[in-house]
Amino acid sequence: MSHLAELVASAKAAISQASDVAALDNVRVEYLGKKGHLTLQMTTLRELPPEERPAAGAVINEAKEQVQQALNARKAELESAALNARLAAETIDVSLPGRRIENGGLHPVTRTIDRIESFFGELGFTVATGPEIEDDYHNFDALNIPGHHPARADHDTFWFDATRLLRTQTSGVQIRTMKAQQPPIRIIAPGRVYRNDYDQTHTPMFHQMEGLIVDTNISFTNLKGTLHDFLRNFFEEDLQIRFRPSYFPFTEPSAEVDVMGKNGKWLEVLGCGMVHPNVLRNVSIDPEVYSGFAFGMGMERLTMLRYGVTDLRSFFENDLRFLKQFK
């Protein structure tokens, strides 16, 4: 009991010198453990008279409490220092720019298709689709394209065999629709088409959209008004538009539509015409009762004109520097 103060002082000195939590725990065991110096002081109580034991026990407990408080204080200091050191090692320079989240965007051709579908959807047109591997009847014969027509030549069309081919136009969708339902018909048919050609303004695969109306009392005036409104809506300009007489086997009369470019020159944008009576007969629709108009346009060409793209192949090269311009 006489050297109790010395034990407390010794314990506090050891505590203050502990450099980490592990060393501090060794000090705790040395002084407060089961066989620690201060714990063993309790065994000396039995040597005292009974009436002195409570007071002596209180003194020992007070000494142990002082050491425990010193341990707690030092442990808090060491843990705080360790935390500060870890935080310093993990410091983040908040002035550095964060990682950018790259948002995707629609392909410019997809944007064009969506824009056109939206316009014609408001006019009551529905979207129709068909197979890309087509037979010669739906791609040619039913559309009033005879066997000797140049479009059937190998250098223009990808043939699988004598009767199957990659469709050269989405007009086959019109034939399938007219075979499946009677007028009134009002559809647009977007999709991929294939032609054996590749240069700055042509690719072997491109996107086309065709439109078809079949009903009673449909005239060329209806066709002109519809396309006139469409082109001004698509280009968002009060464009000068002209219709030039042309020839397509599946329409009569036929026309090609031009718009005046910013350079003062006419630019061809689409082809159109009144559905040929032979086409209506091929799908069992009476041309004496019903009439209709059809139009077809290349999605890549319209996209090029709208955004000022000069090379059609840019749409298929997957160059992000090009595609990001259309987000």
Swiss-Prot record:
* Residues that, per the record, bind Mg(2+): 252
Q: Which cofactor does it need?
A: Mg(2+)
The cross-references to PROSITE patterns, in alphabetical order and at most eight, read: AA_TRNA_LIGASE_II
- Which is a GO BP term held by this UniProt record? phenylalanyl-tRNA aminoacylation
Q: Which InterPro entries match?
A: aa-tRNA-synth_II, aa-tRNA-synth_II/BPL/LPL, Phe-tRNA-synth_IIc_asu, Phe-tRNA_ligase_II_N, Phe_tRNA_ligase_alpha1_bac, Phenylalanyl-tRNA_Synthase, tRNA-bd_arm
HAMAP family the UniProt entry points to: Phe_tRNA_synth_alpha1
User: Oligomeric state and partners?
Assistant: Tetramer of two alpha and two beta subunits.
Q: What protein is this chain from?
A: Phenylalanine--tRNA ligase alpha subunit
Gene expressing this chain: pheS
